[in-house]
């Protein structure tokens, strides 16, 4: 007997009968095939050995970290001062039609003498590059600063014939203070400066200019965790001396012949609590008169001068 679908006047609904079987084109078969040899453990991202290898690669890459972006110095006075101070630069931009004066002429001449690219650009292009800041028709491109690694800084300081002398900065946000401290470190025989990676001044063109060229020969390192770095330096035999107005002793009692790292806090905030706890001693600078505190860079210079004096007399 025929089914209902064969009845006269019956309507066959779509999809009630299976259509022809269609193959997968080999997709299912290929999915069952092998995927090749299993990679070594250190190449597998989720394997413990792979995670250790990735961490080691990141640490190696970070030994000479640079800042994130290049810097653009704007204006005739800042540009000529940077070039006079030997701030490293990659390009000098001059807007077409800019009236030349002594500063612009000197900037172009110094850039040419140092092999810095000199590029003439449309004024609107320079406006865009300067984010509409006041550029006076001239701008200098400064590359990111190449920071040392704290481990390398410690190794180089300990390999020197003189006892290690380093400075660490805590809560220092003014690049001019940083530049002045770098200058003092170079002047008094120090081996370098350590900065925290966050909430700290960076080696910008302003800091470089304030250092009067000392930034070219005095390494600056960035520490991911300043407290951990201070502990590491203490374990390596350095005395950690914190400088604070409320110190327990004065700088006269520092043993300057011992390998030392001086930790300098800001004039306003001083040293943070954890940093104070990681210092072997907290010292202050004796002062006459009502002056309560010194600028951070001045205070650092006074302590470094005292340590240098002791070492000269030894």
Curated annotation (Swiss-Prot):
Gene Ontology biological-process annotations: methylation; RNA processing
GO molecular function, a single term: RNA binding
Signal sequence residues: none
Native organism taxonomy: Bacteria, Bacillati, Actinomycetota, Actinomycetes, Mycobacteriales
Family per record: Belongs to the class IV-like SAM-binding methyltransferase superfamily. RNA methyltransferase TrmH family.
Annotated SUPFAM superfamilies: alpha/beta knot, L30e-like
Residues that coordinate or bind S-adenosyl-L-methionine: 265, 285, 294
Keyword field contains Methyltransferase: yes
A Pfam family reported for this protein in Swiss-Prot or TrEMBL: SpoU_methylase
Protein's organism: Mycolicibacterium gilvum (strain PYR-GCK) (Mycobacterium gilvum (strain PYR-GCK))
Name the record gives this protein: Uncharacterized tRNA/rRNA methyltransferase Mflv_1447
């Amino acid at each position: 007997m025929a089914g209902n679908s064969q009845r006269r006047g019956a309507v066959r609904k779509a999809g009630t009968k299976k259509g022809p079987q269609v193959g997968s084109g080999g997709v299912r078969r290929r999915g069952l095939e092998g995927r090749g040899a299993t990679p070594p453990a250190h190449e597998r991202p989720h394997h413990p050995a792979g995670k250790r290898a990735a961490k080691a690669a990141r640490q190696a890459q970070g030994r000479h970290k640079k800042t994130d972006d290049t810097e653009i110095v704007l204006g005739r006075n800042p540009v000529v001062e940077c070039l006079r101070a030997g701030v490293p630069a990659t390009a000098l931009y001059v807007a077409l039609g800019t009236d030349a004066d002594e500063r612009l002429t000197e900037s172009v001449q110094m850039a040419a003498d140092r092999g810095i690219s000199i590029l003439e650009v449309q004024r609107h292009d320079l406006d865009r590059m300067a984010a509409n800041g006041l550029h006076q028709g001239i701008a200098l491109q400064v590359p990111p600063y190449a920071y040392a690694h704290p481990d390398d800084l410690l190794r180089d300081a300990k390999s020197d014939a003189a006892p290690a002398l380093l400075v660490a900065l805590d809560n220092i946000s003014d690049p001019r203070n940083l530049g002045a401290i770098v200058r003092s470190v170079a002047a008094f025989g120090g081996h370098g400066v350590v900065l925290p990676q966050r909430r700290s001044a960076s080696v910008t063109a302003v800091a470089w200019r304030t250092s009067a060229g000392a930034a070219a020969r005095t390494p600056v390192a960035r520490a991911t965790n300043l407290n951990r770095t201070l502990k590491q330096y203490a374990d390596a035999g350095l005395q950690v001396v914190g400088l604070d107005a409320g110190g327990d002793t004065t700088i006269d009692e520092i043993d300057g012949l011992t390998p030392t790292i001086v930790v300098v806090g800001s004039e306003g905030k001083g040293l943070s609590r954890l940093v104070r706890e990681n210092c072997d001693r907290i010292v202050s600078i004796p002062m006459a008169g009502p002056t309560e505190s010194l600028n951070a860079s001045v205070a650092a210079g006074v302590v470094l001068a005292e340590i240098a004096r002791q070492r000269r007399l030894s």
